[in-house]
């Protein structure tokens, strides 16, 4: 009897496998760290062979650990770090170069050159995206232009490109399927989110041969089956979505205007805008949330590049804390930051500013500043950056947010969640499974594709809020705090 959905969750720092039951509860999980490669300052890569090896190993480990027969797996879901991209040889399955990470800034010059030529407008109109090194297209172009023989082989039709989901599907099916879903395709800067097709003009702008492109399908859809040699049985791959999009679905943000914010290395806020895309005028991006039941759902998104990375920085580089728990303890030991603000723009600024040249800034230091003030300012920076995104989102959508669902590694910090509610002046809701929400969304997509869950109403039965936070400060105090943050941003830009 098929009792579980198995999810492959390939993230920026680890590869993970999770088993979910029909109630959306986690039966078990297994994970392995993935090691980023930093060839030069501002560059970031992954070894794609190691990515696949780590993802496959945690899958077999999990099944063995809980003594789960593959016969009990109804479907496999995939969720992945978005924009990170690689190119491989279709004939051998061997990558021609490492996967270039979404955080990598090596293509700043390519982006600037294309912007100078005036391509930013048409790219925004067709893809909903800002012409920035963050997205996949400039990374693919870089590989074709800089890896010896790559462009020639691509023009001969011998190379394929894909985001992490495509790479996993290729390996799970032993090269039988080269596919992606709408949500991941919409992050490449090559996919027209209105026609739902790869766009010829965009391919021409970035000089990428059409033969490299994966087939695109809905997020909930049987993409194919795993090769029987892997698990001893063919298992349907029923769900695929980028991690932030999957998180929105896992939060059951099915209604127009529903929003979530994920607190990880970066912060990613998405708002469901229904079946029509909203063209942002406030520095956000328009993206495809998911494809389901013959329809496409769109979203507004604010992507903050460096959020929790600021906390990692004070832990790993400055050695101020030993753990996330330490950070919260220090923050609560003082009443405020004593007017210290910190902007962690280590890799430029994302939404809503989109300034790749911005650098990190600390303002307000005095002789009375303590370590505790600085640590608190770093934590508060996550909430302030999310404030900037949410205000832009409200202006674009015309919707004033009453509550915000949260998830991700740093959402366990209750001080941060309370401060977020204070600054936004809205309810913050922390659901169950906050560390596996993206995985849960992928499980829902995979389960819906094979009838494990009948429909979205069936899924809503699994909903549950673990903790709520409500604003505890007045408008006057909120205004003073936000004005200080705005001054810090001015110094950054």
Curated annotation (Swiss-Prot):
Q: Which GO terms describe its cellular component?
A: cytosol
Q: In which pathway does it act?
A: Polyol metabolism; glycerol degradation via glycerol kinase pathway; sn-glycerol 3-phosphate from glycerol: step 1/1
Means of activity regulation: Activated by phosphorylation and inhibited by fructose 1,6-bisphosphate (FBP).
Where does the chain bind ADP? 12, 16, 265, 308, 413
Q: Where does ATP bind?
A: 12-13, 265, 308, 312
- One Gene Ontology MF term: glycerol kinase activity
* Group of enzyme by EC: transferase
Report the EC number(s), separated by commas if there are several: 2.7.1.30
Please give the catalytic activity noted in the UniProt record: glycerol + ATP = sn-glycerol 3-phosphate + ADP + H(+)
- Binding sites annotated in the UniProt record for glycerol: 82-83, 134, 243-244
> Which SUPFAM superfamilies does the entry link to?
Actin-like ATPase domain
Q: Name one Pfam family in it.
A: FGGY_N
- Binding of sn-glycerol 3-phosphate, residues: 12, 82-83, 134, 243
| UniProt KW keywords | ATP-binding, Glycerol metabolism, Kinase, Nucleotide-binding, Transferase
GO biological process per UniProt? glycerol catabolic process; glycerol metabolic process; glycerol-3-phosphate metabolic process
- What is the disulfide pattern of this chain? none
> Which protein family is it in?
Belongs to the FGGY kinase family.
Give the protein's function. Key enzyme in the regulation of glycerol uptake and metabolism. Catalyzes the phosphorylation of glycerol to yield sn-glycerol 3-phosphate.
Subunit structure, interactors included: Homotetramer and homodimer (in equilibrium).
What's the name of the protein? Glycerol kinase 2
Phylogenetic lineage: Bacteria, Bacillati, Bacillota, Clostridia, Eubacteriales
């Amino acid at each position: 009897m098929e009792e579980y959905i198995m999810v492959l969750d390939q993230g920026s720092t680890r590869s993970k496998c999770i088993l979910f039951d029909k109630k959306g509860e986690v039966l078990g999980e297994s994970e392995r760290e993935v090691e980023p490669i930093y060839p030069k300052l501002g560059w970031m890569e992954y070894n794609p062979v190691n990515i696949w090896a780590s993802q496959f190993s945690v899958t077999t480990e999990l099944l063995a650990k809980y003594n789960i027969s593959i016969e009990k797996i109804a479907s496999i879901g995939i969720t992945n770090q978005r924009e990170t991209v690689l190119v491989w040889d279709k004939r051998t399955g061997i990558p021609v170069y490492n996967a270039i990470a979404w955080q990598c800034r090596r293509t700043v010059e390519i982006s600037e050159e294309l912007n100078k030529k005036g391509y930013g407008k048409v790219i925004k109109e067709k893809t909903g995206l800002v012409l920035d090194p963050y997205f996949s297209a400039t990374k693919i172009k870089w590989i074709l232009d800089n890896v010896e023989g790559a462009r020639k082989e691509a023009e001969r039709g011998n190379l394929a490109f894909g985001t992490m989901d495509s790479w996993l599907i290729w390996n799970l099916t032993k090269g039988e399927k080269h596919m992606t879903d709408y949500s991941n395709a919409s992050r490449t800067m090559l996919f027209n989110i209105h026609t739902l097709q790869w766009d010829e003009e965009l391919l021409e702008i970035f000089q990428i041969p059409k033969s490299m492109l994966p087939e695109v399908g809905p997020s909930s859809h049987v993409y194919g089956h795993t090769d029987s040699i892997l698990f001893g049985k063919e298992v349907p791959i029923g769900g695929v979505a980028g991690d932030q999009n999957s998180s929105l679905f896992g939060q059951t943000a099915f209604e127009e205007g529903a929003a979530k914010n994920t607190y990880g290395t970066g912060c990613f806020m998405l708002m469901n805008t229904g079946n029509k895309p909203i063209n942002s005028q406030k520095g956000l991006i328009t993206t495809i949330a998911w494809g389901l039941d013959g329809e496409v759902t769109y979203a507004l998104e604010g992507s903050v590049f460096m959020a929790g990375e600021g906390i990692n920085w004070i832990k790993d580089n400055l050695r101020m804390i030993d753990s996330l728990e330490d950070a919260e303890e220090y923050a609560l030991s003082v009443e405020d930051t004593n007017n210290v603000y910190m902007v962690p723009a280590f890799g430029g600024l994302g939404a809503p500013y989109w300034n790749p040249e911005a650098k990190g800034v600390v303002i307000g230091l005095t002789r009375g500043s303590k370590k505790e003030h600085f640590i608190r300012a770093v934590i508060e920076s996550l909430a302030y950056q999310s404030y900037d995104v949410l205000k832009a989102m409200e202006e674009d959508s015309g919707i004033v947010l009453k509550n915000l669902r949260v998830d991700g590694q740093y959402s366990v910090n209750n001080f941060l969640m309370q401060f977020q509610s204070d600054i936004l002046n809205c309810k913050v809701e922390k659901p169950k499974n906050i560390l596996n929400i993206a995985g849960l969304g992928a499980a829902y997509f995979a389960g819906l594709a094979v009838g494990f869950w009948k429909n979205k109403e069936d899924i809503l039965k699994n909903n549950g809020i673990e903790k709520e936070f409500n604003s505890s400060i007045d408008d006057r105090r909120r205004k003073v705090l936000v004005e200080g943050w705005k001054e810090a941003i001015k110094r950054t830009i």
